Amino acid sequence: ECGTLFSGCSTHADCCEGFICKLWCRYERTW
């Protein structure tokens, strides 16, 4: 599901290129 707004939302996703999920993955990785 790469390339969509919400791509990479799952916690096990290798692809975090969706705009929303870029922010989410960045947030998650600060833990």
Swiss-Prot record:
Keywords, ordered alphabetically: Amidation, Calcium channel impairing toxin, Disulfide bond, Ion channel impairing toxin, Knottin, Neurotoxin, Potassium channel impairing toxin, Secreted, Toxin, Voltage-gated potassium channel impairing toxin
Domain of life: Eukaryota
InterPro entries per UniProt: Huwentoxin-1 (IPR011696)
Subcellular location: Secreted
Protein's UniProt keywords contain Transmembrane: no
Keyword Amino-acid biosynthesis: no
Positions carrying Tryptophan amide: W31
SUPFAM superfamilies hit by this protein: omega toxin-like
Ranges annotated as spanning the membrane: none
Molecular function via GO: calcium channel regulator activity; ion channel inhibitor activity; potassium channel regulator activity; toxin activity
Tissue and organ expression note: Expressed by the venom gland.
GO cellular component terms given for this protein: extracellular region
Disulfide bonds listed in the record: C2-C16, C9-C21, C15-C25
Job of this protein: Blocks transient outward voltage-gated potassium channels in rat ventricular myocytes (thus prolonging action-potential duration) and rat Kv4.2/KCNA4 channels expressed in Xenopus oocytes. Is also a weak blocker of calcium channels in rat cerebellar granule cells.
Family: Belongs to the neurotoxin 10 (Hwtx-1) family. 20 (HpTX3) subfamily.
Domain notes: The presence of a 'disulfide through disulfide knot' structurally defines this protein as a knottin.
Name recorded for this polypeptide: Kappa-sparatoxin-Hv1c
Organism: Heteropoda venatoria
